[in-house]
Amino acid sequence: MSILSSPPLSGDNNVEMNSLSPTFSTLIAPLEAQLPYLTPLASRSNRPLDYTFDFQVRALVYYHTEAFTSAQDLLQAAPEDPLANQLIVPSTGLGESTFYEANVTRGSQQLLELVDRLAKKVSKQLKVPHPALGALVAIDGSLIDASLSMGWAEYTSTRHKAKAHLGFDLNWGLPRQLALTEGNGAERAFVSTFLEPDETGVLDRGYVDYQGFDRWIDEGKHFVARIRKNAHREVLESRPIPPGTALFFFAKVRLGDEAHRMRHPLFLVGFKSRGTIYWLVTDRADLSAEQIAFIFALRWEIESFFAWWKKHLEVYHLISRNPHGVLLQLLAGLVTYLLLVLYFHQQYGERPSLRRLRQVRRQIRQETAIAYLTIYNMDILLALILILGYQRQANS
């Protein structure tokens, strides 16, 4: 299947994206501004690329913005949707094989750079709600259903899944880094990858690693981590517990038994919330027990992000079974989310919400429909004028 470059609009109309949908043009303007600064995408042959990274990333952002459910859904819309046609199809046309080949072989480096650049741009416009707590990064993983044909996505003998590992900036509530592994891929290695010195990783029990704790401290990286209630500990110094709180334990401790004892002491906090007892450790001596508990409570933001991102941007409706293609789609989903954060902040002073997302989708569709009708009527009028002109010439 080949998608023509111009239908349903005439190529002579030369319609700009802003004319088709001012809303979508404004939404992706920060992306367009970053494109010249990304690593150039070079052709692997002597022929220049027609389906460039610019077309590729616009197509993927449009896919998530409009919540298409498959690549076929997007490609079938291109001949009928003038905005999709302009975003996706170069002047030379686009074949299905070219679209799929691009997503499984190229563009990940550019998208990684784009996520980093957009995250930095967004963070400059948002306020830090808790500056005294320092730079906080929640790290977590989310499973993605995979078909049995995706042999690389190992999970169990009967089920295949991939796993997205995410570094989430809790100071600004923004996704920052992403990696992809098979469903049973190790999580702990990404703490060192995602954390910078002087940052504090906020971690659940799956990331507990005594040797890792010592190594992160040696690297100048901090953490607030939940541990199991039966974790072996030696109390080095008891600390006062604030009255009238859910806290019941606060002490300087050393974790591990004789065979697996940590070199560095930690601070252990115990508290009860909604019937559940939590045990948290941190290497940060500057935090109070209440601050330690509060930092861990902020971790729910990464779980809320995963839920909203997956459900409303259709990020896990995969358009590729190839690991590169899956990673590319996840990165494009992060880019789309960051663009929405910027757009909603600039337009309404709000964070992304389903109500505003639906509003944006309605505006894009209405603007595109109006632009299409206007251009279609102009083509008809031009044709009538030409016909009348020919008739007059014939009669004269």
Predicted regions and their residues:
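Single, function-defining residue in the core of a domain
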Residues: 1-73, 77, 104-106, 113-114, ...
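Extended, structured, electrostatic nucleic-acid-contact surfaces
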Residues: 79-89
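Short hydrophobic/aromatic segments of transmembrane alpha-helices and their interfaces
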Residues: 82, 127, 289-290
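Major-groove recognition helix of helix-turn-helix-like DNA-binding domains
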Residues: 87-106
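Short Lys/Arg-enriched helix C-cap and helix-to-coil transition segments
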Residues: 109-122
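A short, well-structured juxtamembrane/interface segment
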Residues: 119-128, 186-188
